[in-house]
């Protein structure tokens, strides 16, 4: 039987899944009051970068410090599911359900988000700073030119796998994290975020959401998609309004 460990990234106390494969981890723990969970500041870590890397400080910790056949990451308010009905907390993906999925493939992903009228690039540029992706492309051009075609293809796509949620065979996660953090650490050297808002300063977490599909496409990886549940109520009117406001107030960008 394969061993599986899935971290649940959180910055606050929250209800957690009961299945033993889940490990709640406090991200940004180096600069916060302990919550009683595993801390991303233990062992080899980049906890100090949490303000800019978001949940990736948890992913880095899992990559460097956990030993399992499969590793994954979800969020305290977002979980995988294969069930359509019933109480959300009773529908969170279990080890028994996951075992059936990983018999078919090595990577589990959330169903893709489709922006329909936006490309991945334009959506990011409307919400953040286009230069983040432009400099990411430069990093790839310099260090990983074999990824450029996949990057351009993903930037022009209207859909993608978001949320930084996945469960991968250890070998796949090793390859992905080695590449991802090498790209992000180089991007960090080149990108000036001194004038960014607190939200936009989370740039490396945002960029990484767009890089997962680049890695998948460049390496011709197969995967299985399953739904994601948001554990709280969402106000879709406000969410849609904010989306429209970002478009109307968007910064200029070329693409």
Regions found by a protein language model. Name each.
Residues 1-255:
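ER/Golgi luminal nucleotide-sugar-dependent glycosyltransferases, focusing on the catalytic module
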């Amino acid at each position: 039987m394969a061993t599986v460990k899935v971290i649940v990234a959180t910055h606050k106390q929250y209800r957690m899944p009961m299945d033993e494969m889940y490990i709640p981890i406090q991200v940004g723990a180096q600069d916060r009051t302990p919550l009683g969970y595993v801390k991303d500041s233990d062992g080899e870590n980049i906890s100090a970068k949490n303000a800019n890397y978001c949940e990736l400080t948890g992913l880095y910790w899992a990559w460097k410090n956990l030993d399992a056949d499969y590793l994954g990451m979800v969020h305290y308010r977002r979980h995988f599911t294969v069930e359509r009905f019933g109480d959300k907390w009773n529908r969170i993906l279990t080890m028994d359900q996951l075992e059936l999925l990983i018999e078919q493939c090595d990577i589990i992903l959330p169903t893709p988000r489709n922006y329909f009228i936006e490309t991945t690039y334009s959506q990011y540029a409307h919400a953040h700073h286009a230069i983040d992706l432009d400099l990411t492309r430069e990093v790839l051009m310099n260090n990983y030119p074999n990824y450029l075609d996949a990057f351009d293809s993903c930037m022009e796509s209207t859909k993608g796998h978001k949320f930084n949620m996945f469960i991968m065979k250890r070998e796949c996660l090793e390859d992905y994290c080695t590449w991802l953090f090498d790209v992000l650490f180089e991007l960090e050297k080149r990108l000036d975020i001194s004038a960014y808002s607190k939200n936009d300063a989370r740039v490396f977490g945002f960029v990484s959401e767009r890089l997962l599909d680049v890695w998948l496409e460049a390496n011709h990886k197969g995967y299985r998609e399953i739904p994601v549940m948001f554990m709280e109520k969402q106000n879709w009117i406000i969410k849609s309004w904010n989306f429209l406001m970002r478009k109307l107030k968007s910064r200029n960008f070329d693409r």
